[in-house]
């Protein structure tokens, strides 16, 4: 079981809300809305996705990585490397 599962419903609600934002963006473009208004909504959707990503990363560190470290062995190094790679991807995005 993964660390985020206790907040699964919350994550799903947030992702559904983001999905609605993206559908709204499609509608705005279809309706020829003003560029800046669309960009403002793109920024809001991007920020919402970043918030989900940071929450999942926090869950990964506090559950998956912490558990692997407590168990010892090579699994800890693998989990730390995965977390480091995920952080690098988030920073680049």
Task: Give short role names for the model-derived ranges.
Residues 1-93:
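Solvent-exposed interaction patches of small proteins and small membrane subunits
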